[in-house]
Every structure is written in structure tokens, then in C-alpha cells.
Amino acid sequence: MVDKRESYTKEDLLASGRGELFGAKGPQLPAPSMLMMDRVVKMTETGGNFDKGYVEAELDINPELWFFGCHFIGDPVMPGCLGLDAMWQLVGFYLGWLGGEGKGRALGVGEVKFTGQVLPSAKKVTYRIHFKRIVNRRLVMGLADGEVLVDGRVIYTANDLKVGLFQDTSAF
């Protein structure tokens, strides 16, 4: 039985990465440094733009984060692909929260737009995921739209984020 709380701490997210939060068969978040959030502040089965579920999470920004030292030297910026990956991470986390089992894999995205950037001077990144559909058959899959905000301003949008949970990934 999954402990369906509305919020999760950093330690909870790290436990997910170790396979302890959703059980041995549940999806896992990545371990640091690829874990792209510090906390989940809201999870609901209703709500969001489509009233089919909503997740909101946050990442605290500081100039010492690993990617600022290498992307780019003299012009540090968080890679946009990390924000996109964070949204996929949250779709998979939500599927585990619903009780889905399997290994999470990103399956695609319909459209991504970048209209801003995350600099070392930023304070906080917020991720908002609005679920459109959950498929719970042989393949468990989530379909959602997402937004990335830096200090309250939308800088990335993604439509039709897709994540599936697989029992066996050997042929994937």
C-alpha cells in the first residue's frame, strides 16, 4: 500500500531513489546529482488544468550546483534538458504515488518551449505538472503538460509529456 501524502521532503525523494518509498516494484527517482527537485509541495488526484491530477515540486538554486561549473564556463546556466527531465521524473513519481509498478521510462514529449533560463543568481525553480490522462493496463502510462518556473516566472513549457512503467526493460 502506497503512503499517499500530499507532499514529500528531500529525504522522502532520496528514499524513492533507493527503492524504499513505493516498494521494491515501484518506480524510483534518480539519485543525486540527477534528482532535479528538493521537495514535492503538492500532489492531488484531481486538480490541475484538466482536473485529472496535479504535482508541484521545487528545486532550490545555489551557485554551487554541479551543472553551473560546466555549462558553460564563464556563462553558467542550468541545461534546459534538466528541467525537461525533472518534469518526466515527476510524471513517473506520480505514477508510483498512484500505486503503479515498474521501472519508469520517458516515452516522449509533444512540444517543448524555452522562453527563459535558470542562472546561478536564481533562488527557486518550481515545476508544475497537469495530468491529462493515466493509462493503467498492461502498460502504466502518464500523459501530462508541464511548466518550469524560475522565481515565479514561467520559462519552459512542455505539452504531452509521456512516461511509462515497465516490468521488464531488457527489450526497451
UniProtKB/Swiss-Prot annotation:
The keyword Isomerase applies. GO terms for biological process: unsaturated fatty acid biosynthetic process. Keywords: Cytoplasm, Fatty acid biosynthesis, Fatty acid metabolism, Isomerase, Lipid biosynthesis, Lipid metabolism, Lyase. The keyword Repeat does not apply. It catalyses: a (3R)-hydroxyacyl-[ACP] = a (2E)-enoyl-[ACP] + H2O; (3R)-hydroxydecanoyl-[ACP] = (2E)-decenoyl-[ACP] + H2O; (2E)-decenoyl-[ACP] = (3Z)-decenoyl-[ACP]. The active site is at residue 71. It is found in: Cytoplasm. Its EC number is 4.2.1.59, 5.3.3.14. GO terms for cellular component: cytoplasm. Belongs to the thioester dehydratase family. FabA subfamily. Necessary for the introduction of cis unsaturation into fatty acids. Catalyzes the dehydration of (3R)-3-hydroxydecanoyl-ACP to E-(2)-decenoyl-ACP and then its isomerization to Z-(3)-decenoyl-ACP. Can catalyze the dehydratase reaction for beta-hydroxyacyl-ACPs with saturated chain lengths up to 16:0, being most active on intermediate chain length. This is 3-hydroxydecanoyl-[acyl-carrier-protein] dehydratase. The gene is fabA.
